[in-house]
From Swiss-Prot:
It holds the Pfam family SmpB. Coiled coil: none annotated. PROSITE patterns: SSRP. It is found in: Cytoplasm. Its main location: cytoplasm. The gene is smpB. Disulfide bonds: none annotated. This is SsrA-binding protein.
Length: 149
């Protein structure tokens, strides 16, 4: 598995409740841009329309060697999942306080571009502060243990 991009801010801003791997409907120049890691998914989110999942604000830069048939960087892309997974996710989207955001884009062992999406719940400010405290404490513990050895 080759990781192309990771949305680390999503793990900081949200509690991840459930994760899914989904395929994406892409054109050739988008796949080539993904291989060059020219993607930004900081503001991306997933919406349901007509029992299909669509990802919005996923910026895949234009492939510089493509001609006039190049793709639009911010176009809405369809996600490919099993029907029962789509029903579960769509039901969770309708629950207030829950959202679906992308966590990472990767190429699987067969070389197919996939996206890991998650059902998330927003963190409060004090939860974020607690996460920062624990992260800093883990970092400090590792520094102390390296000095003692």
């Amino acid at each position: 598995m080759e990781i192309v991009a990771e949305n680390r801010k999503a793990r900081f801003d949200y509690f991840v409740l459930q994760e899914y791997d989904a395929g994406m409907v892409l054109v050739g120049s988008e796949v080539k841009s993904l291989r060059q890691r020219k993607v930004n998914m900081g503001d991306a989110y997933v919406l349901e329309k007509d029992m299909e999942l669509w990802i919005h604000n996923l910026h895949i830069s234009e492939y510089n060697r493509a001609d006039r048939k190049n793709h639009k960087p911010l176009r809405v892309r369809k996600l490919l999942l099993r029907k029962r997974e789509i029903h579960k996710i769509a039901g969770n989207i309708k629950v207030s306080g829950l959202a679906v955001v992308p966590l990472m884009i990767f190429f699987n062992n067969k070389g197919i571009a996939k996206i890991k999406i998650a059902i998330v719940k927003g963190k409060k400010l004090y939860d974020k502060r607690e996460a920062i405290k624990t992260r800093d404490w883990q970092r400090e513990k590792s520094r102390i243990s390296r000095r003692e050895v």
